[in-house]
Amino acid sequence: FSMFASLSIGYNHPYVLENKDRLTAAAINKPTNSDIYSPMMAEFVETMGRVAQPDYLPYSFYVSGGTLAVENGLKTAFDWKVRHNLAKGKGEKGSQVLHFKQCFHGRSGYTLSLTDSPDPRKVQYFPKFNWPRVTPPSMTFPLNENNLANIISLEEQSLNEIKNAI
């Protein structure tokens, strides 16, 4: 099951209904597959670059889904950080990911180590990395005096946990 972020748009949105044939063709050709290029993917990349991609970020990489986006982002960060540290003579460092508790980033490879599964039986026998996990400074609404004091306290706690982890 997926679509947590996009389900709010829904299947009955007028754009979806008006473009169902085009969207069906896109689904059949999977335009986000970066190994097989289609005219639809080329159109998408051109539109995304024109509308949403700033000039100072000249490259783009598309994957199918949030979990794989996080996974590929982590691999990119590991690669960059380790190379950066090697070039500075600091050795092969850069494979730790500091992250918040109570989070969900998916259930594939690296993301399992970042996700709190509500049912531990789903992932209990999967190998995971023991990466530093800190308290999230989550806001509670309405943002009244008590809730504001609580978020300030949680932010301080989170910063202290980050400092201790580093």
Stretches with model-predicted labels:
Residues S2-M3, S64:
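Glycine/serine-rich anion-binding loops at beta->alpha junctions
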Residues A26-A27:
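Short alpha-helical transmembrane segments in multi-pass integral membrane proteins
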Residues F1-S2, T135:
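Short beta-strands and strand-loop turn motifs
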Residues F4-L23, S34-T47, S113-D116:
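A structural motif shared across PLP-dependent enzymes of the aminotransferase-like
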Residues E46-I166:
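PLP-dependent aspartate aminotransferase-fold enzymes
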Residues S6-L7, P31, Y59, I152:
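Short, flexible active-site loop motifs that bind/organize anionic cofactors or intermediates
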Residues P31-N33, F100:
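Generic beta-sheet signal
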